[in-house]
């Protein structure tokens, strides 16, 4: 399975005129949340609402601020939690954001594929 990157824009949910410039992020289906540089998020007025702990691939536990933003990439959009990444942290587009976009990842074609909406219940009268 190959990896690829996309440009992500984060939008302030309280003031949608405030956005980040496009941020190149690795599409990472192994990461639950999206990680974007803290300074770039803060420049758009996006603020942390709490601090969460994360376990790295090396088993180290780290703490990072987490907030909410509208995330856009490749023509898709969702509101999601975003981790305020520190220098040295990877910039990642996580699986929850991908689920919010309602896409699957075509890792061979290096693109997102829109999923069909699933109707949970349908009654035809």
Q: What does each of the following model-derived ranges do?
A:
Residues 1-125:
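Pepsin/retropepsin-fold aspartyl endopeptidases
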């Amino acid at each position: 399975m190959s990896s690829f990157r996309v440009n992500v824009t984060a939008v302030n949910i309280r003031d949608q005129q405030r956005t980040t410039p496009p941020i190149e992020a690795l599409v990472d289906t192994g990461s639950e949340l999206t990680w974007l540089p803290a300074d770039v998020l803060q420049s758009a007025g996006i603020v942390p609402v709490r601090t969460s702990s994360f376990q790295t691939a090396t088993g180290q536990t780290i703490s990072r601020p987490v907030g909410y933003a509208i995330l856009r990439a490749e023509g898709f959009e969702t509101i999601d939690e975003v981790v305020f990444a520190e220098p040295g942290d990877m910039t990642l587009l996580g699986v929850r954001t991908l689920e919010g976009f309602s896409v699957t990842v075509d890792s061979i074609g290096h693109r997102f594929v829109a999923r069909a909406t699933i109707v949970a219940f349908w009654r035809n009268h």
